[in-house]
Curated annotation (Swiss-Prot):
InterPro entries (UniProt xref): Fum_hydII (IPR005677), Fumarase/histidase_N (IPR024083), Fumarase_C_C (IPR018951), Fumarate_lyase_CS (IPR020557), Fumarate_lyase_fam (IPR000362), Fumarate_lyase_N (IPR022761), L-Aspartase-like (IPR008948)
Name of the coding gene: fumC
Organism lineage: Bacteria, Bacillati, Actinomycetota, Actinomycetes, Mycobacteriales
Enzyme Commission identifier(s): 4.2.1.2
Entry function: Involved in the TCA cycle. Catalyzes the stereospecific interconversion of fumarate to L-malate.
Matches recorded under SUPFAM superfamilies: L-aspartase-like
Protein name: Fumarate hydratase class II
Keywords attached to this entry: Acetylation, Cytoplasm, Lyase, Tricarboxylic acid cycle
Pathway: Carbohydrate metabolism; tricarboxylic acid cycle; (S)-malate from fumarate: step 1/1
């Protein structure tokens, strides 16, 4: 007798809307399958970090429900074990729903509930996805809670250490080059001298400030909606459910930043904590763009650019021009920055469009902010390791450029006056002479300006005040 191909490859599941055909080996069930069929949009699912957070949360909720005598210990143990497998990444392929789905994340919450129930069933424990796994919860508090757990962990465990590594690499270069003098530039035009170390100290401070911004948003980012259930009133959950769940999560993750939401209505109706955190990430993206672009410009050449520094040669740069090497990592940094800024725009739009008791842009906002955390973390580490650490300075070339800049006439203002100094600069530029020689040619050495005073004033390293670089503040 021939075997029906459909019966071999699919099984029938049911929910409150009726029967659904589900792939035979899938751990998900009816509600997940409906969402798979309803939202074949981008081919992009939840971030791995959010799936992990959903697993952590479901396990914590089961523990609390058991502690309160609401859930049988056998069922609680089965949920906790299955949820741990999900958190560890053993079942990522069982989360097929597109990120562009119902705006509350209900589909992904039920996906989690169904997978946990199916894992438990393999161990001989029967669980209902709603009655047991989702006990004392709704999608409206679990999905935002998982989002904030994942974002907080991404910030504390991953992004901040990566930014610290980048800061340290930049600060090391600032110290190494604190006496390497170069021409300053404002408006992309020659300005008075600075040191390469001073420039890099500025970059290091930008990253340090970025770390401070991320840390500053953690008190709001770490607020969790769990316990508010559908609309923030806590209906169908014990009064202290959220507090207990958060305590379990803090113990499991070590994230002391996690806390019960100050106001459960705000925690479900608005996503301001995500918007704020994304704003910090956007600012970091802006900082990285500035730093990467400066480094690209300083490394431009090798013969027709600035050629002030040399970037590590990482890979051939052209499929047609032999020997060409490009600044590939700074280019990757600026592309990441563009993506993060775009993600932030979508997050802001999503945050602005919550309505009454629930924001319904959470899956998109979650995906975007978690992607931004991931991109910034990875590119910051690579930028530090494979670019900044290997930079070298063309010291003599830098000094020649500094000494040839007409702007070094500036310290002569107090001796010969602004207008005469401007005339010196213009003549030096026109005649391709040094400022020193032009001052002498114009007969300006005399009572107001001795040759010794001229040389002292034209010391480009002294102009840069390199001794003011405070290593303790890097």
């Amino acid at each position: 007798m021939a075997v029906d191909a459909d019966s071999a490859n699919y099984r029938i599941e049911h929910d409150t809307m009726g029967e659904v055909r589900v792939p035979a080996k899938a751990l998900w069930r009816a509600q997940t399958q409906r969402a798979v069929e309803n939202f074949p949009i981008s081919g992009r699912g939840l971030e791995r970090t959010q799936i992990r957070a959903l697993g952590l949360l479901k396990g914590a909720c089961a523990q609390v429900n058991s502690d309160l005598g609401l859930l049988a210990p056998e069922k609680a143990d089965a949920i906790i074990a299955a949820a741990a497998e999900i958190a560890d990444g053993q079942h990522d392929d069982q989360f097929p729903i597109d990120v562009f789905q119902t705006g509350s994340g209900t589909s992904s919450n039920m996906n989690t509930n169904e997978v946990i129930a199916s894992i438990a069933a393999k161990g001989g424990v029967t669980l209902h996805p709603n009655d047991d796994v989702n006990m004392s919860q709704s999608s409206n508090d679990t999905f935002p809670t998982a989002t904030h757990i994942a974002a907080t962990e991404a910030a504390v465990a991953h992004l901040i250490p990566a930014l610290q590594q980048l800061h340290d690499a930049l600060a090391a270069k600032a110290l190494d080059w604190h006496t390497v003098v170069k021409s300053g530039r404002t408006h992309l035009m020659d300005a008075v001298p600075v040191t390469l170390g001073q420039e890099f100290s500025g970059y290091a401070r930008q990253i340090e400030a970025g770390i401070e911004r991320v840390r500053a948003c953690l008190p709001r980012l770490g607020e969790l909606a769990i316990g508010g259930t559908a609309v923030g009133t806590g209906l169908n959950a014990p009064d202290d459910f959220g507090v207990r769940v958060v305590a379990v999560l803090v113990a499991q993750t070590g994230l002391s930043e996690l806390r019960t939401a100050a106001n459960s209505f705000e925690a479900q109706a608005a996503r301001d904590g995500l918007v704020e955190a994304s704003g910090a990430l956007r600012t970091i993206a802006v900082s990285l763009t500035k730093i990467a672009n400066d480094i690209r410009w300083m490394g431009s050449g090798p013969l027709t650019g600035l050629a002030e520094i040399q970037l590590p040669d990482l890979q051939p740069g052209s499929s047609i021009m032999p020997g060409k090497v490009n600044p590939v990592l700074p280019e990757a940094v600026t592309q990441v920055a563009a993506q993060v800024i775009g993600n932030d725009a979508a997050i802001a739009w999503g945050g602005a469009n919550g309505a009454f008791e629930l924001n319904v842009y959470i899956p998109m906002m979650a995906r975007n902010i978690l992607e931004s955390f991931k991109l910034l973390t990875n590119v910051s580490r690579l930028f530090a390791q494979r670019c900044i650490a290997g930079l070298t300075a063309n010291v003599e070339h830098l000094r020649r450029l500094a000494e040839s800049s007409p702007s070094i006439v500036t310290p002569l203002n107090s001796a010969i006056g602004y207008e005469e100094a401007a005339a010196v600069a213009k003549q030096a530029l026109k005649e391709r002479k040094t400022i020193r020689q032009t001052v002498i040619d114009r007969g300006l050495i005399g009572d107001r300006l001795s040759i010794e005073d001229l040389d002292r004033r034209l010391d480009v390293l002294a102009m840069a005040k390199a001794e003011q670089l405070d290593s303790d503040r890097l």
